[in-house]
From Swiss-Prot:
This is Tetraacyldisaccharide 4'-kinase. It catalyses: a lipid A disaccharide + ATP = a lipid IVA + ADP + H(+). One of its GO terms (molecular function) is tetraacyldisaccharide 4'-kinase activity. Pfam families: LpxK (PF02606).
Length: 343
């Protein structure tokens, strides 16, 4: 059914038209909810530090998490104390939790675990992102800026900067769920607060900043050792991906000159279990970094030669120039106890 809808969302065919009346009701509810927050009839919370929300208006993944990691590293390079909050999609609990190196992935969620591993920044997860942010600031009161992963529709959290992310799907047929892929009306949502638009695909459908994404030229084992992908170029390998667009990962592996003997396209946030790898015993298996945070934790991952291939994601310089232009005035209003790290 998912694939049927994804196909229907590309155009305004018979199925999309059949669902269009429901989409109109969805649109009314979306606009009503936003109006209630805007008029203060539903409560929202503002924090003393700048909050940057990264999200999308299209259902499914579009590259939000790689952008969050790129933002964190950008701010860290400037010496800023930065934290991250997330709902932690797919996690087993709902309580607020700091994601640490030893936190089980089923408690943190795969994306928060990856963000913490890749950046070392404080990462907090909770069902309500406002609670996660309160706990983050209580634990790290000198934090200068907070990045919220996937929170564009979480209006209970007031934000200073909004970044909307799009892949090559753009807005699809331009209709709201379930007749189309849109969670919110576009470009109406652009006029109502989105500050920056970033395209993560190769063919931007409309105006916005662009980015470059490709796989690294090496893969990483569980012990942290690296292996050049060229060393795998003349042997068949298995590739698996439990992300929103597995085929994109497979295509990038092929672009690196690899021969994929078998591909395993799994649902986004797939919950790997002990025994899942038995059928691949003795094989060389390439996976995404997001899958690796779960697979490396399995006691039987040593049965296979499991390697994670990092994604290199770089927004164009003009994007960061625009972002810094928005953030700098906000940082200047912070107390002196916030801001740059001391060395």
């Amino acid at each position: 059914m998912k694939q049927v809808l994804l196909k229907a969302w590309r155009a305004r065919g018979w199925l999309a038209r059949l669902l269009w009346p429901v989409a109109q009701l969805h649109g009314l509810l979306v606009r009503l909810r936003r109006a209630l927050y805007r008029r203060g009839m539903l409560s929202s919370e503002r924090f003393k530090v700048p909050v940057i929300v990264v999200g999308n208006v299209v259902a499914g993944g579009a590259g939000k998490t790689p952008l969050v990691m790129a933002l964190v590293k950008h701010f860290q390079a400037q010496g800023l104390r930065v934290g991250v909050v997330s709902r932690g999609y797919g996690r087993s609990g709902h309580e607020s939790l700091e994601v640490r190196p030893g936190t089980p992935v089923d408690e943190s969620g795969d994306e928060p675990a990856l963000i913490q591993h890749a950046t070392g920044a404080p990462v907090f997860v909770a069902q309500r992102r406002t609670q996660a942010l309160r706990d983050l600031l209580a634990a790290y009161p000198a934090t200068a800026v907070v990045v919220c992963d996937d929170g564009l529709q979480h209006y209970a959290l007031q934000r200073d900067i909004e970044i909307a992310v799009f892949d090559d799907r753009g807005v699809g047929n331009g209709w709201l769920l379930p007749a189309g892929p849109l969670r919110e009306p576009w470009p109406e949502r652009l006029r109502q607060g989105v500050d920056l638009v970033l395209h993560t695909g190769q063919q931007p459908a409309f105006e916005g900043y662009t980015s470059r994404r490709q796989l690294a030229d090496h893969a990483v084992a569980a012990d942290g050792s690296s292996l050049a992908l060229t060393a795998l170029a003349h042997q068949p390998v298995v590739a698996l991906a439990g992300i929103a667009s597995p085929e994109a990962f497979f295509d990038m592996l092929r672009a690196r000159g690899l021969t994929l003997q078998k591909t395993l396209a799994l649902p986004d946030h797939h919950d790997f279990k002990t025994g899942d790898l038995n059928a691949l015993a003795g094989r060389t298996v390439l996976c995404t970094e997001k899958d690796a945070v779960k697979l490396f934790a399995l006691p039987d991952h040593s049965k296979i030669k499991l390697l994670a291939v990092p994604l290199e994601f770089s927004p164009e310089p003009a994007f960061f120039t625009a972002l810094d232009g928005l953030l700098t005035p906000l940082l200047s209003q912070l107390p002196s106890s916030h801001g740059h790290q001391t060395t």
